[in-house]
Amino acid sequence: VVAMFTRYGTFAKHLRVNYSPGVQTAQAGYGGDMDFGPKLEYHNFRTALHEAGHALGVGTTWQWGAQLSNGVWQGAAGRAQIKAFDGAGAEAYSDGTHYWPYGMNYNNEAGTVNFYRAVQMIAAFRRDMGIGP
């Protein structure tokens, strides 16, 4: 996951990966800690990429919420990136914590192209939030 972020973006952040038996699935916060619980179905690239997004500010900073209006991302970089991927009418949506498309919220989102797009979306969101690189 770190190699994917390094190859396709510039991110200045230290991540710590922990095994936490009390965590049901996986979780991460902006402080950089990514916690994975005992359920092996969450020990995968898709989940790690999703949690790295949280560690990088996705849904975990006040700046994230400031970019949303009625569940739609308003930042210029994020809007331009999603439109570059999916066309002029595309939008990035959020429930306040997670985003879609390309948020790696479910296993059916996994795949090389979507992994790349997730990293690019996170980079764009961070530019909009002013917390990059």
Give the location of each predicted region.
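Zn2+-dependent metallopeptidase catalytic core
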Residues: V1-K13
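Extracytoplasmic/secreted envelope proteins and their assembly/folding machinery
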Residues: V2, D33, L49, G53, ...
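Hydrophobic/aromatic-lined pockets within catalytic cores
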Residues: T6, G57-T61, R126
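Catalytic zinc-binding patch centered on the HExxH motif and its immediate surroundings
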Residues: A12-D33
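Solvent-exposed loop/turn segments at secondary-structure junctions
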Residues: S20-A26, K39-H43, W62-W64
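Short pre-active-site segment immediately N-terminal to the catalytic Zn-binding motif
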Residues: G32-L49
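Metalloprotease/metallohydrolase-associated module, dominated by Zn2+-dependent proteases
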Residues: Y42, Q63-P133
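Active-site recognition of the HExxH zinc-binding catalytic motif
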Residues: R46-T60
